[in-house]
């Protein structure tokens, strides 16, 4: 599959609206991405710029070379280090010679692999001509908060095996993949849903932690609120171990699966992850 239809599921739209076609081709070992807006989208939303590397006009627009990656606005729909690690391990489960360091997938493969329900932002993806979104089956729904300890156990088993340079057991990868594969950052985490239907990111203790990082993150969130900073709702869940699970409500989700579209600072500035060494850009920008 080298084409995907991109659909806007933004909370302020009355109905979901198709945006255009995203395509990926391999040319001499490089991934070449192209995107073509639908005429109807541009007619209705010509003032919305999705990212600096996409202009609002008809016809295909291209990105060349592996160093460029995918269009920035769609890169925001991809997982980061933790999610990519889970996705690589899941893809390697069919390999007879499994390893703790599986082959890294491409951006295109990550985009197609992760769960629709936990994907960051307001974009949804499907095969052109299909009404069904990629990885949107009912069994991929976000797990309830009651399963928090079970998810933490899976994360710890995966970390322990990787630390021993052993491939994790398939059951732990499968258990954590759907709620955790869309997540960013390096620490183990997963999405969970509370009893009111609100979606939270659960940040689990790492086996390498030397103090209760979750508790300190929770304290930092409370201090930020006291200072008048607009922050997400947070909770702290104590475990039967010495450390806590830090819960932070997802800012890109509302109850009843309403999605709030988001764009990262990298997308808004037209920058790439890790480009600071070459450009001098950093968080101050």
Model-derived segments and their meaning:
Residues 1-285:
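Phosphate/dinucleotide-binding and metal-coordinating scaffold of catalytic cores
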């Amino acid at each position: 599959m080298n084409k995907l239809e991109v659909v806007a599921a933004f909370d302020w739209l009355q109905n979901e609206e198709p945006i255009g076609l995203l395509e990926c081709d391999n040319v001499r070992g490089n991934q070449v991405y192209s995107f073509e807006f639908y005429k109807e989208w541009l007619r209705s939303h010509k003032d919305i710029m999705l990212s600096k590397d996409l202009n609002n006009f008809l016809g295909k627009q291209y990105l060349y070379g592996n160093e460029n990656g995918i269009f920035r606005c769609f890169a925001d729909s991809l997982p980061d280090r933790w999610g990519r690690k889970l996705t690589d391990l899941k893809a390697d489960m069919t390999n007879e010679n499994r390893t703790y360091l599986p082959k890294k997938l491409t951006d295109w493969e990550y985009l197609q692999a992760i769960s629709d329900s936990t994907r960051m932002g307001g974009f949804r993806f499907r095969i052109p001509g299909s009404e069904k979104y990629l990885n949107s089956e009912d069994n991929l729904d976000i797990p309830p908060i009651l399963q928090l300890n079970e998810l933490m156990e899976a994360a710890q088993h995966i970390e322990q095996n990787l630390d021993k340079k052993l491939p994790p057991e398939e059951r732990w990868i499968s258990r954590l993949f759907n709620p955790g594969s869309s997540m960013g950052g390096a620490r183990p985490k997963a999405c969970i849903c509370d009893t009111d239907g609100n979606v939270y990111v659960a940040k689990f203790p790492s086996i390498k932690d030397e103090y209760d990082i979750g508790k300190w993150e929770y304290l930092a969130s409370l201090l930020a609120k006291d200072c008048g900073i607009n922050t997400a709702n947070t909770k702290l869940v104590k475990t039967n171990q010495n450390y806590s699970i830090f819960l932070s409500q997802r800012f890109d989700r509302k109850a009843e699966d309403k999605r709030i579209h988001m764009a990262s600072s990298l997308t808004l500035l037209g920058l790439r992850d890790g480009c600071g060494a070459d450009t001098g850009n950093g968080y101050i920008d």
